[in-house]
């Protein structure tokens, strides 16, 4: 596997399945950066224990060389997404924990994940990762996603289930009895330590600010787009929808400006990303379309929108685009500097790469 020459930049991509790509500048060096991959221990006795492996990226050819001293423990079980802060030496890993039945992160309200946490690491010399003795916890149940804002000031975690169902109606409207949530943290730029950002808009029945921000039930993914954090949620039975919060870059605060979700008229969405001024939603539904009078079938669709008033998605002129005919069960999209690439992840496949500033990556992995 090779990377093209990157130049002096820092970039990170974290996707579902636990993928982290970190590029750091190394002037006058044969190493242009480091790539980190999260996964689980292959030992049968520790099959769910999380680990982080790492590679040096060769300056000229992009060849990968294992970093001495890695892998290290991720600080928990079944690591999922990870975040490398732009311009920083800190890495945050979301360990999703494990259920009590088979030890996987496939958790529900009745079979919850235990041991879920966010572990903090610092990048040292030669790309070595050292855990900082700091472990943080989201406020909800069964965390599934996390990202940092573009400035690296705030970290957000998407939880499958809010800790208190009575709070759902307070933010989402009367009659709502179940929901997920977003936990927000402020990042200390010196230590990397996380401090909880409480909900300044919604208070609990006791009059205390909620320590989280409710989102519609069955959340799938979320994204920062323009001045909104948009959550994608739903099931094949109920259909998929998006729900926006107005985002403050100064305080990290999220504010509800509409209580209802926006239906997308799709039912198997797997990802939402923001790139090049657009929002892209990946739908894993098979559907037919006509080209030149010929009916063709696509196993997935990519929907492009722009963000309108109050965070509502407005369909782009190009509308929907059929996914590659050979890619089934896609789960993520990768933004590249001039295009969006659909990505299929198979079991155990946890390594991808995407865009960089400056020169384009010439080679992309698809399928």
Give residue spans per PLM region.
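Sec-dependent bacterial lipoprotein signal peptides
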Residues: 1-26
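Predominantly soluble domains enriched in secretory-pathway, periplasmic, or organellar proteins
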Residues: 23-367
């Amino acid at each position: 596997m090779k990377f093209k020459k990157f130049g002096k930049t820092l970039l990170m991509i974290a996707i579902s399945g636990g993928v982290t790509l970190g590029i750091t500048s190394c002037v006058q060096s044969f190493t242009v950066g480091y790539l980190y991959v999260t996964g689980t221990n292959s030992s049968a006795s520790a099959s769910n224990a999380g680990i982080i492996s790492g590679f040096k990226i060769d300056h000229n050819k992009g060849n990968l060389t294992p970093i001495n001293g890695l892998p290290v423990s991720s600080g928990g079980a079944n690591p999922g997404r990870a975040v490398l802060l732009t311009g920083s030496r800190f890495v945050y890993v979301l360990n999703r924990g494990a259920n009590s039945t088979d030890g996987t992160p496939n958790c529900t309200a009745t079979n919850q994940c235990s041991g879920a946490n966010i572990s903090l690491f610092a990048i040292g010399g030669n790309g070595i990762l050292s855990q900082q003795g700091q472990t943080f916890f989201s406020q909800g149940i069964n965390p599934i996603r996390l990202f940092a804002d573009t400035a690296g000031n705030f970290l957000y975690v998407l939880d499958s289930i809010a800790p208190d169902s009575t709070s759902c109606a307070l933010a989402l409207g009367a009659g709502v009895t179940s929901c997920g949530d977003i936990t927000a943290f402020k990042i200390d730029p010196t230590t990397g330590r996380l401090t909880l950002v409480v909900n300044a808009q919604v208070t609990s029945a006791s009059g205390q600010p909620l320590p989280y921000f409710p989102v519609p039930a069955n959340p799938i993914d979320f994204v920062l787009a323009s001045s909104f954090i948009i959550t994608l949620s739903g099931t094949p039975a109920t259909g998929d929808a998006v729900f926006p919060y107005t985002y403050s870059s100064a305080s990290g605060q999220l504010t509800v400006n509409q209580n209802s979700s926006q239906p997308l008229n799709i039912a198997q969405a797997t990802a939402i990303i923001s790139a090049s001024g657009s929002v892209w939603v990946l739908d894993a539904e098979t559907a037919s379309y006509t080209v030149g009078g010929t009916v063709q079938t696509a196993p997935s669709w990519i929907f492009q929108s722009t963000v309108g008033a109050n965070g509502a998605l407005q369909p782009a002129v190009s509308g929907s685009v059929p996914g590659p005919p050979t890619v089934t069960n896609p789960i993520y999209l990768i933004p590249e500097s001039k295009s969006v690439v659909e990505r299929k992840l198979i079991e155990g496949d946890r390594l991808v790469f995407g865009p960089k500033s400056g020169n384009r990556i010439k080679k992309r992995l698809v399928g």
